[in-house]
Amino acid sequence: MIKAEKLSYSFPQKELYNKVSFTIEDNVHCAFIGTNGTGKSTLVDMILHPDDHLYEGKLTMDVPGRIGYVSQFYSLDEEKEETVFTYLSETFVQLQNQINEICDAMATAEDLEPLMEKYQTVMDEFQAIDGDFYESNIHKQLKVAGLKDYEDKLLTHLSGGEFKLVQVIREMMISPKFIIMDEPDVFLDFEHLNALKDL
C-alpha cells in the first residue's frame, strides 16, 4: 500500500502539490493522469526516493517485497552489443555467479557457517524470482508480448516501443510486489499497447 496524507511539494517558482491525499491499495491498478510538467514523474521519484525530497505531509509506503520500476527515460550504450535475452537474463546470471563463487569459497574455507548463511540468502533470492526456470519464463513473456523471435536481437536494433516492452518484462520477471511505470505508453503504438496490457 502507498498512502499520501496532505502532501505538499513545490519548486522555487512552482507549486506542484498542495495538501494532496491518496491511497493505492494492494492488487489494484492506478494511473496518475496530467499534462506535461504537472509533476507525475516527480511524484514517482518521491515515492521511490522519499528521502531525496523536502516535502510537507506524510508519505507512507508499505510494500512487503520487491518494487519494480520502469522509467520513461533510458539511454542505451550504442557500443554495447547486448541481446534481448542477455538483458532479460542479467539479474539471474548475476545471482548464479554469486552462488558459484560462494560454492568455490566453501571448498577451501575453514569456517563454513558465514558462507552457508550467505549461500542460503542468495539462493532464497534466486528461488523467489523463479530462477530455476528463468530461461523458459523469458521465452513465455516474449511470446506474450509478441516478441517471440527477438531473443537474439540486439537492444540497439529495437524500436522504442519494442524496448519499452522488454523493459517491462525485465521488471516483471523479478516478481515485484509492486511495479511503478512512468509514462508506460511512451513509444507504444496500438499493437504494442495491447501487448503491454497482456503482460
What are these regions (language model features)?
Residues M1-L199:
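ABC ATP-binding cassette signature C-motif
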